[in-house]
Amino acid sequence: MTALTKADMADHLSELTSLNRREAKQMVELFFDEISQALIAGEQVKLSGFGNFELRDKRERPGRNPKTGEEIPISARRVVTFRAGQKFRQRVGNEQID
């Protein structure tokens, strides 16, 4: 299984548009920066036909060191969640697996 990288996205964008590779790379970076900044500002990011990104706060909870069995607290933190939209789930779910 291969991975799609930001560089791959920029290359594909430059092939489909009149942007050169440098401009396409900047466009991809700006896209992800915009999503990051919106999440940092506490906004929900809704991409129609794709899905929603949201920042959630997780409370502190008890955990366990798997090597020693010692109980340790897992600190509170913020996590990014993604919920795929219905159209996206249908499109991905209907693809054939080789």
From Swiss-Prot:
Taxonomy, superkingdom: Bacteria
Keywords from the UniProt entry: DNA recombination, DNA-binding, Transcription, Transcription regulation, Translation regulation
Annotated signal sequence range: none
MF GO annotations: DNA binding; structural constituent of chromatin
UniProt-listed GO biological process terms: DNA recombination; positive regulation of metabolic process; regulation of DNA-templated transcription; regulation of translation
GO cellular component, one term: cytosol
Disulfide-bond pairs as recorded: none
Coiled coil (residue ranges): none
PANTHER family cross-referenced by the UniProt entry: DNA-BINDING PROTEIN HU (PTHR33175), INTEGRATION HOST FACTOR SUBUNIT ALPHA (PTHR33175:SF2)
Known role: This protein is one of the two subunits of integration host factor, a specific DNA-binding protein that functions in genetic recombination as well as in transcriptional and translational control.
Subunit organization: Heterodimer of an alpha and a beta chain.
Family the entry assigns: Belongs to the bacterial histone-like protein family.
Protein name as it appears in the record: Integration host factor subunit alpha
Species: Acinetobacter baumannii (strain ATCC 17978 / DSM 105126 / CIP 53.77 / LMG 1025 / NCDC KC755 / 5377)
Chain's gene name: ihfA
